[in-house]
Curated annotation (Swiss-Prot):
It is found in: Secreted. Belongs to the formicidae venom precursor-01 superfamily. One of its GO terms (biological process) is killing of cells of another organism. This is U-poneritoxin(01)-Om2a. It comes from Odontomachus monticola. Residues 1-25 form the signal peptide. Keywords: Antibiotic, Antimicrobial, Cytolysis, Hemolysis, Secreted, Signal, Toxin. Cationic amphipathic alpha-helical peptide with antimicrobial activities against E.coli (MIC=6.2 uM), S.aureus (MIC=6.2 uM), and S.cerevisiae (MIC=50 uM). Also shows histamine-releasing activity (30.1% at 10 uM) and a weak hemolytic activity (10.4% at 50 uM). Truncated sequences of this peptide have also been found in the venom. It is possible they have been cleaved in the venom. Its main location: secreted. One of its GO terms (cellular component) is extracellular region. InterPro entries: Pilosulin. Pfam families: Pilosulin. Expressed by the venom gland.
Amino acid sequence: MKPSGITFAFLVVFMMAIMYNSVQAAAIADADADAEAKAFADAFAEAGWGSIFKTVGKMIAKAAVKAAPEAISAMASQNEK
């Protein structure tokens, strides 16, 4: 039995509705995540934790700069084998 054009049109519209809803849900989730991240950052700023994380970040960056040449040479030696 051959499906009619109306059946095909219904399926196309149904698929478009599903895709539209998934895109809308993703946009809402992104907006929620952005708002949550901003609220988290604001709470840290109000609590005075920003300077602590800035200091810790600098310490991590210094350690990474010191460790980078060793890590690069180790990876290069693994690639040569």
